[in-house]
Design a protein with these regions (language model features):
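Phosphate-binding site of ATP-dependent enzymes
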Residues: 142-229, 242, 250
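Active-site nucleotide/adenylate-binding loops and adjacent lid/helix of ATP-dependent enzymes
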Residues: 3-7, 69-75, 79-176, 210, ...
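Conserved N-proximal alpha/beta basic substrate-recognition cap immediately N-terminal to
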Residues: 2, 9-107, 111
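Glycine-rich phosphate/pyrophosphate-binding beta-alpha loops
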Residues: 56, 138, 197-198, 255-265
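Anionic group-transfer/hydrolysis microenvironments
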Residues: 55, 133, 169-170, 182, ...
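ATP-dependent carboxylate activation and anion-phosphoryl transfer catalytic cores
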Residues: 213-281
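A short beta-turn/loop motif at secondary-structure boundaries
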Residues: 41-43, 135, 170-174, 242-245
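A short beta-strand motif that forms the metal-chelation/ATP-contact edge
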Residues: 47-52, 180-183, 248-260
Length: 281
């Protein structure tokens, strides 16, 4: 069996998950090959499945990446499924999850070419987090201190062609960081603690943690909604959360396109993912 691990040509940083996955697939008798998604020579239909991994440069080639998803899904099995990937590319999904009753960090979407009322946003939320609605990693994600309208407008101007997200900066993110819960086949695998990350920062995993019961419950409610929406079973998902002012966990992002899975931190995790992928092919 041949499995493609989709990555990208101009990697912003090494993907530590890739060699671990190649070895884990080999242990199950499958051949995993690392293939850049934008490689015009790639014959996707020759693979039994394409597992989306570190396609991190799609942010600057959104339409091309959308077309690639369509093309691969028509040629072979795409993991995660096409519908789930397309839904997750634009972070408007956070508003949908909030409307469904999921505890989500308050999120406003600023459509491309428009300017929000920054003064009102600062008055409502204090310090802000501003980032593109289509992004990977910490691309163009900044903290804007309360009242710094000039900085907010400058960032808006620099990314005028993009939809942006505006969220309050959670105090817990600054003081403690966030918790990322990794799931394979809808089941919890492992969790890591990460520090705050801004534009240009590297991933800052601080090691494995045991999530609290309310964090596990939030992650399950998020994944249950995705399942009920008909997006098909998810081979992998990373549910990122932090605690709000009242101490409750709040969803920050649901990563089902190209999340780092921190397989090097969790012995056996790669085997669990491989089992799910091979079981679906």
């Amino acid at each position: 069996m041949r499995i493609a691990l989709a990555t990208c040509l101009d990697m912003p940083r090494p993907d530590a998950d890739l060699p671990i996955l190649v070895e884990a697939f080999a242990a199950r008798g499958a051949r995993a090959e690392v293939v850049p998604w934008e490689d015009p020579r790639a014959e996707w239909g020759a693979f039994d499945a394409v597992l989306v991994r570190s396609t991190w440069n799609y942010v600057g080639r959104y339409r091309d990446f959308h077309a690639w998803i369509d093309r691969v899904a028509a040629a072979t099995r795409l993991v995660n499924p096409r519908a789930a990937l397309l839904w997750n590319l634009h972070k408007r999904y956070l508003a949908e999850l909030a409307a469904a009753g999921i505890a989500v960090v308050p999120t406003g979407v600023v459509l491309h070419g428009t300017e929000p009322d920054w003064e009102a946003l600062f008055a409502r939320h204090g310090d802000l987090v501003v980032k593109p609605a289509v992004s990977a990693g910490s691309f163009a994600t900044i903290r804007v201190r309360r009242g710094d309208v000039a900085a907010a407008r400058a960032h808006r101007e620099a990314h005028l062609e993009r939809d942006l997200l505006v969220q309050p900066l959670l105090a817990s993110v600054v003081s403690h960081g966030e918790t990322n819960l990794v799931h394979f086949g809808g089941r919890f695998s492992h969790a890591v603690h990460k520090g705050a990350r801004w534009d240009g920062d590297a991933e800052q995993s601080r090691g494995l943690v045991t999530p609290a019961a309310d964090e596990l419950a939030l992650a399950q409610s998020v994944l249950a909604h995705v399942g009920s929406a008909g997006f098909g079973p998810l081979a992998y998902a990373r549910v990122d959360m932090a605690r709000g002012a009242d101490g409750r966990p709040l969803l920050m992002e649901l990563e089902i396109v190209e999340p780092s899975l921190f397989l090097d931190r969790a012995p056996g995790a790669a085997d669990r993912l491989v089992e799910v992928v091979l079981g679906a092919v």
